[in-house]
Amino acid sequence: METLTAISRWLAKQHVVTLCVQQEGELWCANAFYLFDAQKVAFYILTEEKTRHAQMSGPQAAVAGTVNGQPKTVALIRGVQFKGEIRRLEGEESDLARKAYNRRFPVARMLSAPVWEIRLDEIKFTDNTLGFGKKMIWLRSSGTEQA
């Protein structure tokens, strides 16, 4: 679990995810503030149902995306590419995620947007601080970690 621990530690320090969905061959990307749950290996975001990405996702859909910093030096590049599934949360599951999200982003208390979970199934973490092009991969299906 060393790979997942390193990835989780880095993701916990970031706050913006780019997510991409598709519907009938049409692609769309969006940015959102996220809360990362290391135990569930999932992001939680708030987004209105009327947004294009939510409309294309429906209640549940495949998703891919990235999280990255903005370093000015190639040697400091770090970032995640992922694929997984996005779904709108309901009921108690939504309430629990919203409470945690509001702790991370207190201003979100004023928003009524639904809570969505992005369950990560594959993560590739590039970390040039460990050496140029250093990559770590985590796969949910097999618990596999590659360095």
Swiss-Prot record:
Similarity remark: Belongs to the UPF0306 family.
In Swiss-Prot or TrEMBL terms, this protein is called: UPF0306 protein YhbP
| Species for this entry | Escherichia fergusonii (strain ATCC 35469 / DSM 13698 / CCUG 18766 / IAM 14443 / JCM 21226 / LMG 7866 / NBRC 102419 / NCTC 12128 / CDC 0568-73)
